[in-house]
Curated annotation (Swiss-Prot):
Known function: Acts as an anti-CsrA protein, binds CsrA and prevents it from repressing translation of its target genes, one of which is flagellin. Binds to flagellin and participates in the assembly of the flagellum.
Subunit structure: Interacts with translational regulator CsrA and flagellin(s).
Family of this protein: Belongs to the FliW family.
Statement: the UniProt record of this protein carries the keyword Chaperone: yes
Protein name listed in UniProt: Flagellar assembly factor FliW 2
Cellular compartment(s): Cytoplasm
Gene Ontology CC annotations of this record: cytoplasm
Signal peptide per UniProt: none
Keywords of the record: Bacterial flagellum biogenesis, Chaperone, Cytoplasm, Translation regulation
Xref: HAMAP family: FliW
Name of the coding gene: fliW2
Cytoplasm keyword on record: yes
Length: 135
């Protein structure tokens, strides 16, 4: 699905349109819709599949995305891929929030002070191992 970014992705402020493609129930791919030399192409993860994950969407983001009780909100976190997938890092402090009802999206920068259990480079393997131990 295509989205218009109402608040930019950090480091990609020049990109306002993105395409979100689901790879599977865990991973998705986000691509910028621009011919800029600084193209956006990143892997995202559904944080709720990895851990307990809850945060308050700031009021200004609610307003920008026109969120209401009927909105279909999707939340993803950026994955910094490594050669070995399990060594990849997840940024839980800067989630991407999408309102699929109207096609708006934004990145939210969370404070470590407010969310001390969230990291910006948590190794994916720490969550994969926990999942294997449950099986």
């Amino acid at each position: 699905m295509n989205y218009f970014l109402k608040a930019p992705i950090l480091g990609f402020e020049h990109i306002s349109g993105v395409r979100l493609e689901k790879i599977d129930s865990l991973f998705s791919r986000l691509m910028g819709q621009t011919n800029s030399p600084m193209a956006l192409d990143m892997v995202l993860v559904n944080p709720y599949c990895l851990r307990e994950y809850s945060f308050v969407i700031p009021k200004y983001i609610e307003l920008l995305l026109e969120l209401d009780s009927h909105s279909k909100v999707e939340v993803y976190c950026v994955v910094v891929l490594q050669k070995n997938l399990e060594d990849s890092m997840v940024n839980f402090l800067a989630p991407l929030v999408f309102n699929s009802k109207n096609g708006f999206g934004a990145q939210v920068a969370l404070s470590m002070m407010d969310y001390p259990d969230f990291g910006f480079r948590d190794p994916l393997k720490s969550f994969v191992i926990k999942e294997r131990e449950r099986a």
